[in-house]
Amino acid sequence: MKYQLTALEARVIGCLLEKQVTTPEQYPLSVNGVVTACNQKTNREPVMNLSESEVQEQLDNLVKRHYLRTVSGFGNRVTKYEQRFCNSEFGDLKLSAAEVALITTLLLRGAQTPGELRSRAARMYEFSDMAEVELTLEQLANREDGPFVVRLAREPGKRESRYMHLFSGEVEDQPAVTDMSNAVDGDLQARVEALEIEVAELKQRLDSLLAHLGD
C-alpha cells in the first residue's frame, strides 16, 4: 500500500477526521486543538502525552505529504489544520461516511471487534445493525485500491474477531492472552466508553461556549 503512517501520524489524522464530524464548529483545528485531541483520555488507545513540538513536527510532515493542509487568513489569528487524507477535492481516497467512521476509530484505538467499532463509532455514524458494520468492514478489506482493513485471528474468550486498519503497513497478529479478565464482553465495555466520550465532548463544547461568552 502507498499509505505508511507512523503511530503518531495515524493519531493526528484520526483526530482531525473525528473532530471534523463530531465538533464541526471547532474545525479546522489549531496546533493546541490537535494536541488536546491527541492526548484525549477517552476514545484513545494508547493514551498519549504529546508535547506541542511533537505534534507540530507531525503536522509539518503530514502537510509535506499532502495529507493535511493549513488554513489561515479570513479572521483566523492562528494557523489551523484540516485533513486531506480522504474525500478531498483532488485526493484519490474516497470513503463513505460509514467507512470514515470505522477507519477513524481504528486509527484512534487500534484493533477492535465489529461490536466495539459499532459502539465507539456511533458519534460519527449510526450503523443500523451489526450486519452493516460487517458489510462495511468487508468492503474496506476488498476494495480495489486497498485493502484498508484486515481481520485478525479471534482471541480466546472473545465472540468476535478483531479488525485492524492497514494504513500503517501489514499487521502481525498479537499473541493470544489467556488472562480471563480479557474475556469481558467487549460490547458492554464499548458502550460504557461511548457514553464517557459523549460526556467529554459535551464538556468540551460547554467550555468552548463559556470561553466565547467570556470574550
Curated annotation (Swiss-Prot):
Family annotation (InterPro entries): DUF480, WH-like_DNA-bd_sf, WH_DNA-bd_sf
Q: Which UniProt keywords apply?
A: Acetylation
Cysteine-cysteine disulfides: none
> What domain of life?
Bacteria
Residues bearing PTM N6-acetyllysine = 80
Q: State the family it belongs to.
A: Belongs to the UPF0502 family.
**What HAMAP family does the entry give?**
UPF0502
The protein, known as: UPF0502 protein YceH
Query: What broad taxonomic lineage does this protein's source fall under?
Result: Bacteria, Pseudomonadati, Pseudomonadota, Gammaproteobacteria, Enterobacterales
Provide the gene name from the record: yceH
